Amino acid sequence: MNTAVILTARKERDSQIPYPLLPIDGKRCLIDRTLQLLRELHYERIILVVGYCHEMFQRFAAPDVTLVYNAEYEITASMGSLALVKDQIDGDFLLIEGDTFFEKQLLERLSAVPHGNCISYTEESGSGDECYIETRNGFVTKLTKDRHRVCRFEGEMIGVTRLCQTTFLRMIQEWERSSNPYLNYEYLLTDV
């Protein structure tokens, strides 16, 4: 697996600058750090889906980084952005939410998974944008942003997921039949 997709299109409610571009250590921003980690792990194809303030992301374009513009970022959610890369995905890949801070070890572990899907999760953060996880026998049975729908709370998604191509293609098929532009990719993960 040598491909990663980073979703960065949305406009944050409380910031004029996209979260992935805010400095995290005085000089680097989150996208700088994420790209560095992916390169250290020999990812050769990185697709950055941009929308709000898309021109601010142009500096990241490189031979190994392709920018895809979601012109409808204001009226679509994460699945709308993810669907834009359907013609560029030819195998399994890492899906990363651009405003997510994570350890290199997480990428190493997900990259080492030989096949299938793998969702990373942690304890509840209280960020207000959680996607809660319920599992049964080691398998995810429910993903929801509504905590009231979870009987056996396991945690929340981190925002870094290994997706197999078969699942991704099923998600795309469901998206193309959907009438809801605000659909988040997390919901389709358990629907397919």
Where do the protein language model's features map onto the residues?
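N-terminal nucleotide-binding beta1-loop-alpha1 segment
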Residues: 1-17
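Conserved N-terminal catalytic core of the sugar/cofactor nucleotidyltransferase
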Residues: 2-6, 28-93
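Cofactor-binding loop segments of dinucleotide-utilizing enzymes, especially the Rossmann-like FAD-
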Residues: 7-10, 51, 98, 122
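Short glycine-enriched, charge-decorated loop/helix-capping segments at active-site entrances
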Residues: 18-24, 177
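Conserved beta-loop-beta/alpha segment of the NTase-like Rossmann-fold superfamily
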Residues: 59-136
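Conserved core of the sugar-phosphate nucleotidyltransferase
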Residues: 103-179
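Catalytic core and acceptor-binding pocket of nucleotide-sugar-dependent glycosyltransferases
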Residues: 179-192
